């Protein structure tokens, strides 16, 4: 059934109702915060945000006698938006409730535009972004390349992970091998694993140890299954593929941080169908295609759009094999999706 289209007045009314609900929730939260701060709060200490639930977050204590314990914390109104992976200063209250009083500086930030085009952080202090895809649902180079551009733009090292390797067969093997070969040639690390059978999971674990990682990828590629395999004690629900669309049903409802026994953390974030890049410029996208680095700026014309212009270095690179057609197609698709003012 086609999705119902809402007119402007209906959209306005929905936003008005949502705004009123948010205001009521904020008022209740403010009253709770006043009660807490009016009571006996403990000293300031550092903590790690391991989950976010609207106006509250779960914080793991990082020092003192309560190190490792988890507290549900309220947020002061003057704080910026917090996300899983943030390091904060907080004070403990009664009955396992606390108050966050400050956000510590982030080393990295992974952001994406929300439905209104506003930038929204989704994870903080990450140093490894694991781009997960699988034989089913069919992987798309354009989506993988969007993640790679986002990783390069954020300064976060990427790892390409083909999950469900046990589903590779004679029909899909040629296309998958060709896809992986492009990224291996570029120097990106690529792993093939099967969370279901356990193949390659030790190699994946060694890549994750000592890092703060986040799994990204469309729904149905097995991110939750990977978490369950890496951390059997977790309770991450796994959803089946939709029989109608062949895409995954969303299971994880909030980004959550897990610890590995040998050190390092994993942030399991909600599955998303497409990673928006409306917040980046044309130059950012070009910088995100690492094989372009030696070519950008060498075109005959300074305002070259790398389409049909004579003397275009990227088109020459395409002819010479330095640039793969698959990547050029992704680049053009991403550029076409950017707002006009990003050019």
UniProtKB/Swiss-Prot annotation:
Identification of the protein by name: Small ribosomal subunit biogenesis GTPase RsgA
Domain CP-type G: 116-275
Function: One of several proteins that assist in the late maturation steps of the functional core of the 30S ribosomal subunit. Helps release RbfA from mature subunits. May play a role in the assembly of ribosomal proteins into the subunit. Circularly permuted GTPase that catalyzes slow GTP hydrolysis, GTPase activity is stimulated by the 30S ribosomal subunit.
PANTHER family named in the record: SMALL RIBOSOMAL SUBUNIT BIOGENESIS GTPASE RSGA, SMALL RIBOSOMAL SUBUNIT BIOGENESIS GTPASE RSGA 1, MITOCHONDRIAL-RELATED
Pfam families found in the cross-reference section: RsgA_GTPase
Requisite cofactors: Zn(2+)
A cellular component annotation (GO) from this entry: cytoplasm
UniProt keyword annotations, A-Z: Cytoplasm, GTP-binding, Hydrolase, Metal-binding, Nucleotide-binding, Ribosome biogenesis, RNA-binding, rRNA-binding, Zinc
The EC number(s) this enzyme carries: 3.6.1.-
Residues that coordinate or bind GTP: 163-166, 217-225
Localization of this protein: Cytoplasm
């Amino acid at each position: 059934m086609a999705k119902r289209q809402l007119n402007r007045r209906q959209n306005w009314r929905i936003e008005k109702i949502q705004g009123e609900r948010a205001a009521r929730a904020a008022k209740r939260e403010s009253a709770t915060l006043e009660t807490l701060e009016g009571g006996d709060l403990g000293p300031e200490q550092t903590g790690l945000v391991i989950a976010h639930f609207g106006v509250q977050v779960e914080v793991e204590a990082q020092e003192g006698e309560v190190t490792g314990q988890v507290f549900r914390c309220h947020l002061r109104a003057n704080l910026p938006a917090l996300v899983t992976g943030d390091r904060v200063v907080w004070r403990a209250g009664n009955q396992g409730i606390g108050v966050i009083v400050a956000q510590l500086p982030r080393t990295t930030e992974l952001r994406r535009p929300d439905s209104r085009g506003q930038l929204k952080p989704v994870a903080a202090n990450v140093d490894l972004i694991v781009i997960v895809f699988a034989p089913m649902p069919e992987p798309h180079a354009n989506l993988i390349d969007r993640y790679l551009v986002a990783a390069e733009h954020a300064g976060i090292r990427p790892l390409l992970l083909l999950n469900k390797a046990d589903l590779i067969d004679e029909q899909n093997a040629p296309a998958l091998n060709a896809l992986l070969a492009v990224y291996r040639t570029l120097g990106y690390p690529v792993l093939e694993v099967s969370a279901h059978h356990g193949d390659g999971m030790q190699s994946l674990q060694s890549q994750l140890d000592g890092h703060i990682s986040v799994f990204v990828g469309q729904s149905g590629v097995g991110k939750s299954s990977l978490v369950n395999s890496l951390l059997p004690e977790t309770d991450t629900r796994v959803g089946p593929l939709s029989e109608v669309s062949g895409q995954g049903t969303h299971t994880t409802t909030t980004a959550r941080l897990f610890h590995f026994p040998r050190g390092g953390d994993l942030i399991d974030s909600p599955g998303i169908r497409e990673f928006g890049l409306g917040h980046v410029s044309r130059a950012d996208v070009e910088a995100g295609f690492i094989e372009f680095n030696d070519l950008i700026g060498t075109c005959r014309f300074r305002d070259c759009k790398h389409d049909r212009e004579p003397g275009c270095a990227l088109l020459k690179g395409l002819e010479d094999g330095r640039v793969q057609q698959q990547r050029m197609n992704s680049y053009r698709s991403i550029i076409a999706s950017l707002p006009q003012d990003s050019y």
